[in-house]
Structure formats: structure tokens, C-alpha cells
Amino acid sequence: MEILLATTNLHKIREFKEMCKAFAHLEILSLHQFPAYMCPEEVGTNFKENAISKAEHAAKHLNRWVLADDSGLVVPRLSGKPGIYSRRFAGLEATDEENRKKLLLEMRQLINKEDRTAYYECCLALSSPTGLQKCVQGICEGFILNEARGRNGFGYDSLFVKNDYEKSFAEIDEAVKNRISHRRKAFERLSAFLENLRD
């Protein structure tokens, strides 16, 4: 059975394909295979609303089962920023490095580790052409470093250290990150549903 990932993000595609290896009956596609499709504008006020909107829109317009992800970094002491604007925190065309620099700038007065707590949040929405079927959430808690460390990962990974770990998400092996990430936690809550999903 085919499931379309509503993303063109190569990092996310690779991560999801790795997690889906346990489900031999599923074939994972991405929006790279549907270049004419136009994603809806993200107008939700939280990750859940955006994930559902992306999943339902693609499922309806492409007449397929669709799995959509909306995720980002939340810093409570910054009133939840960057939050749903994680990918475009420093501007619509901002690079990962520019987004990280803006985050560090906004956190420059937060010296104590307890003031630098943060968490990654992921919401996954699974939709069929007839509508939403399942929506789940995963969270990974940690804190923000004073400077970037590591070369793996993407986004804010080089600034984020998971609680009980010493290395940033960009310093640990990708396979390890994929076992402990917010996306993995959300995916595990979807696993039973995917296991029973058939054409």
C-alpha cells in the first residue's frame, strides 16, 4: 500500500523511510513525485492544525493516503518561539544557520540552564481521500546550547541537547537520533494503526 509523505524535506523523508522499514506492506512516496502539487499555506495556530491541514489537503487533491508532519522547536522562556515558525524564524527564505543565529540572539540574556529548557514537538496527521484518520503527537525535551555543536542533523539540531544526553542532536549518530526523537515518539503512537492499514 502506498502512503505519500506530504513533504519535500530530504531529511524528513529519509527519517520516515527508515522508520517505515518495519512495515513491509507500505511503500513510501514523497511530494518530489508530484511536482505539480501546490501545498496549502500554513495558517494554523499550532503544529496539530498545520499537520491536519497538510494531510487532508494533499489526500483530497491527490486522491491518496497521506502522512503529514508539522514540527518545530519550542522555548518556553521565549513564549514558545520559534514554535510553528521554526522553519522561517529569521524570515521566509532563511537558512538553518540564520534561524539558529536568531534563536541564540533572542536567548543571549538567558544564562542559566533552567532558563534554556526547550522541546521539539512533532504532530503527525494521517488522512485518506475521505478525511482525517489519525493524529498523534511526540515531544522530546532538552535544552539549548550557547553555541552550535556538531555537523549532523538539520534545523536546530546543533543547538539542542536532549535531557540525559551530553551531545547535541547534531553530534550523535543519525540512527541514535532517529530512535529518541520527537518524530520517532509520534510515529510509535501511529504504528499500531499503520500495521493494520491495508488497501
Curated annotation (Swiss-Prot):
Enzyme class, one word? hydrolase
Q: What is the required cofactor set for this protein?
A: Mg(2+)
Q: Which reaction does it catalyse?
A: XTP + H2O = XMP + diphosphate + H(+); dITP + H2O = dIMP + diphosphate + H(+); ITP + H2O = IMP + diphosphate + H(+)
Sequence positions that bind substrate: T7, T8, N9, L10, H11, K12, S71, F154, G155, Y156, D157, K177, H182, R183
- Extract one GO cellular component term from the record: cytosol
Keyword annotations? Hydrolase, Magnesium, Metal-binding, Nucleotide metabolism, Nucleotide-binding
Q: Where does Mg(2+) bind?
A: E41, D70
Gene Ontology terms: biological process: nucleotide metabolic process; purine nucleoside triphosphate catabolic process
EC number, UniProt record? 3.6.1.66
In terms of InterPro entries, this protein maps to: dITP/XTP_pyrophosphatase (IPR020922), ITPase-like_fam (IPR029001), RdgB/HAM1 (IPR002637)
Molecular-function GO term, any one: dITP diphosphatase activity
Annotated catalytic residues: D70
Q: How is the cofactor bound?
A: Binds 1 Mg(2+) ion per subunit.
Q: Name one Pfam family in it.
A: Ham1p_like
Report which superkingdom the organism of origin falls in: Bacteria
HAMAP family hit by this protein: Non_canon_purine_NTPase
Q: What does this protein do?
A: Pyrophosphatase that catalyzes the hydrolysis of nucleoside triphosphates to their monophosphate derivatives, with a high preference for the non-canonical purine nucleotides XTP (xanthosine triphosphate), dITP (deoxyinosine triphosphate) and ITP. Seems to function as a house-cleaning enzyme that removes non-canonical purine nucleotides from the nucleotide pool, thus preventing their incorporation into DNA/RNA and avoiding chromosomal lesions.
Similarity comment: family membership? Belongs to the HAM1 NTPase family.
Per UniProt, subunit arrangement is: Homodimer.
Q: What is the recorded name of this protein? A: dITP/XTP pyrophosphatase
Q: What taxonomic lineage is listed for the species of origin? A: Bacteria, Pseudomonadati, Chlamydiota, Chlamydiia, Parachlamydiales
